[in-house]
Structures are given as structure tokens and as C-alpha cells.
Amino acid sequence: MQFDPPLQPAILLKRYKRFLADVITPDGRELTLHCPNTGAMTGCAAPGDTVWYSTSDNAKRKYAHTWELTETQQGAVICVNTLRANSLAKEAISSGIIPELSGYNQLKSEVKYGEENSRIDIMLQADDRQNCYIEVKSVTLAEKEYGYFPDAVTTRGQKHLRELMAVAANGDRAVILFAVLHSAIDRFSPAHHIDARYAQLLTEARDKGVEILAWKAELSTTKMTLNKPIAVVLNPGK
């Protein structure tokens, strides 16, 4: 995925109302950016961090600029636009980068499924195999070399795991793909210390046939690619 036109830098002043952030550009202008991230954004939004933003040519948008990346004062690069995770996953699957998800000839998005009024992020289909349901989650919370999900309690995420377990029980493939969008993360673990129920359900899902994948993105201010598998550790420290 390439950024065209290129992203522009600014210094973060503050994030507020979840969806907004004030920044100051190198030439001294103060802008308000749209923040496409409803999470806690722990470690991704410290005042003084460098942010990189895109600009839309849609005149109907109230906020023309979108916060895409954070470059922290410690040197990490993070994609904070959670909407990019699905696009990166689709690109990686279509390009054959993820071997576990290769061999399908149809890719569909936002397909209704399950008994809890859900939509699957990605469905893969082929004539000679069962359907593959893929839920994509964006990982940006870093503590030491570990990346954690979620960064806040997520009843919606818990629902998705229940739905995936039902898919596996019905004989189709069920996959949860954690898209790691933080340059300092080398391993993935569920956030027991934030949402213990989600962590418990993830282990239960694994035991009931849900496949767990974690792939790390190569991030820059010009392009992003989901291209590196990393270890999944369901119970770190044990």
C-alpha cells in the first residue's frame, strides 16, 4: 500500500473527543486532523510525537486531513489508522504473501454471518475447499517487545471470537489475523491485563479450531506492507 500523495508531518499537540487531534505543521500552522481510531491509543498519542497525515480532496469532508502514522519520541513508527488493517490484509492475501491463506480465487468483504448480527472482515472462497472466514484486528499497544490486543475492554471483539468458534464448529475455516502495526513489536499476546475475558476466549477459540495468525507490517511514510509473521504467545510468562 502506497501513500499517494505522500504523507505530511506535524507535531501532535493533543488528541481529544476520540476522533480529533490538533497538530502544528513545520511552517507553524495549526490543523485539526480526523483520528480514525476509537481505541485508547496507549503509547501512540503523546504530545510532542511526530504525526504523519494524509489529505483528502473531498470538499464535503469537514476535516480534510487524516492521522495515519505516529513516529514516537522513542523512535517507533505506528499506524494509528485502524481502517488500514483490513486493506493491508487483503493486499497481503491477494499477493500470496500469507501462505496459510493462499489458494483461494475469491475474496469478499463485510459478508454477513453468524447468529450475533456480525459481518466478517474477509471471506475467502474456492471450489475445492471450505469457506475461510477471517477477522482482522489491528495491534498497536506495545510493552517491551510484545504487542497486545485489545488496548481496552472489547465486548465486540469477544463477540467476534464466539462467532468464529461457531464457524469452525460448522466445518468452515475460521481465522483471526492480528495485523501488527507497530515497529517495536516482535511477538503478539492477548492483553490478559486489560481484557481477561477476551484472552480467555482467544485460548478457547484456538482449542476449538480457530486459527490464530499474527503478521507485522513494514511501515514507512511512503508505503506499508504486511509481510512478516511473528510469534503468538497466548500465555506469556508461563
UniProtKB/Swiss-Prot annotation:
Gene3D superfamilies per the UniProt record, alphabetical: 2.40.50.580, 3.40.1350.60
One Pfam family in the UniProt entry: SfsA_N
Recorded superkingdom: Bacteria
InterPro entries found in the cross-reference section: SfsA, SfsA_C, SfsA_N
GO MF terms held by the record: DNA binding
Family: Belongs to the SfsA family.
PANTHER family in alphabetical order: SUGAR FERMENTATION STIMULATION PROTEIN A (PTHR30545:SF2)
This protein's name: Sugar fermentation stimulation protein homolog
The organism of origin for this protein: Klebsiella pneumoniae (strain 342)
Lineage, highest ranks first: Bacteria, Pseudomonadati, Pseudomonadota, Gammaproteobacteria, Enterobacterales
